[in-house]
Amino acid sequence: MPFVDLEVPTMTTPTPAATPARPRVLTGDRPTGALHLGHLAGSLQNRVRLQDEAELFVLLADVQALTDHFDRPEQVRENVLAVALDYLAAGLDPQKTTCVVQSAVPELAELTVYFLNLVTVSHLRQNPTVKAEIAQKGYGERVPAGFFVYPVSQAADIAAFGATLVPVGDDQLPMLEQTREIVRRFNALYAPVLAEPQAQLSRVPRLPGLDGQAKMSKSLGNAIALGDSADEVARKVMGMYTDPGHLRASDPGRVEGNPVFTFLDAFDPDPARVQALKDQYRAGGLGDVKVKKHLIDVLNGVLAPIRTRRAEYERDPDAVLRFVTEGTARGREVAAQTLGQVRRAMRLFGH
């Protein structure tokens, strides 16, 4: 889908940002590539449920994506609408979900600056999530400043939209706790105007890559994208890593660490059937080809309605653009309301 320039939404009278009767949830993604099954299991299925239970905001965090893709802005730009299309295909409803483009809400950047004064460099350096990411990216002592402080930007996002609930995995808990610390410090120092968010801890284990590696990633070539065809899914599944010691169907095999069974745990709607397959595989008598063919059927069953919705929205690209522009306008109104409260609490000039 070609990218259309997204203008910063024209401000109207801000809508009140009082604590909603239902929880307000903020979640989102960095638009650096197409979404895949890891996103579906880890967050998208939960978001589809949450949009009926909460006031759901989904952030296309293109500014955060630039902290480690600053030399590839075109990639980030092109993926904004691509990821929005993935959202709609996965089942997010424009009438229930507010989709916001981060770079089109300048209030987020201003709030980030105020929050930077409330956290120390040493505290940021101790964040285990950031430490792990710095090591993974091999930055050493050459960490871009924008990347180093992105947890503060995340805190500003959460506070600006008044989120009371934030879905996170175990690895993201330190990030959310840092947000809570910043919010508490702001409220104690100035005035209690910001909501302190709570964590909704994901119970879904992270899907491994098709090659058995810990992370599924399109850039690593070990992912099944939400937009993959049935034939592409079949080809990728047949090439999946399994137990290297399971050479013949009659051999006992290992289920633990076998991504085929991890995927079945995540997507097969019949746990009893999965358990029976595991028992048979462990005992010997179940070949990799047979269990992979079953996984192909399961995954294509999961992806079939997603493909149908994708085709509908691909025929109506204006609907995808409206999802983003109207959501961003709504998001900016909420962020402006919060920023106004922040400025008054800080007694800034003119407030």
Curated annotation (Swiss-Prot):
GO terms for cellular component: cytoplasm. Residues 1-24 are annotated as: Disordered. Its EC number is 6.1.1.2. The keyword Nucleotide-binding applies. Residues 9-24 have a biased composition (Low complexity). GO terms for molecular function: ATP binding; tryptophan-tRNA ligase activity. ATP binds at residue 218. Induction: The level of expression increases 2.2-fold, 5 hours after exposure to radiation, and returns to near a base line 5 hours later. It catalyses: tRNA(Trp) + L-tryptophan + ATP = L-tryptophyl-tRNA(Trp) + AMP + diphosphate + H(+). PROSITE patterns: AA_TRNA_LIGASE_I. Keywords: Aminoacyl-tRNA synthetase, ATP-binding, Ligase, Nucleotide-binding, Protein biosynthesis. GO terms for biological process: tryptophanyl-tRNA aminoacylation. It comes from the Bacteria. A motif ('KMSKS' region) lies at residues 215-219. A motif ('HIGH' region) lies at residues 31-39. Homodimer. Forms a complex with nos; one homodimer of trpS2 binds one homodimer of nos. NCBIfam families: trpS (TIGR00233). Catalyzes the formation of 5'adenyl-Trp and tRNA(Trp) but with 5-fold less activity than TrpRS. Increases the solubility of the nitric oxide synthase oxygenase (nos), as well as its affinity for substrate L-arginine and its nitric-oxide synthase activity. The complex between trpS2 and nos catalyzes the regioselective nitration of tryptophan at the 4-position. This protein may not be involved in protein biosynthesis. Belongs to the class-I aminoacyl-tRNA synthetase family. This is Tryptophan--tRNA ligase 2. It comes from Deinococcus radiodurans (strain ATCC 13939 / DSM 20539 / JCM 16871 / CCUG 27074 / LMG 4051 / NBRC 15346 / NCIMB 9279 / VKM B-1422 / R1). The lineage of its organism: Bacteria, Thermotogati, Deinococcota, Deinococci, Deinococcales.
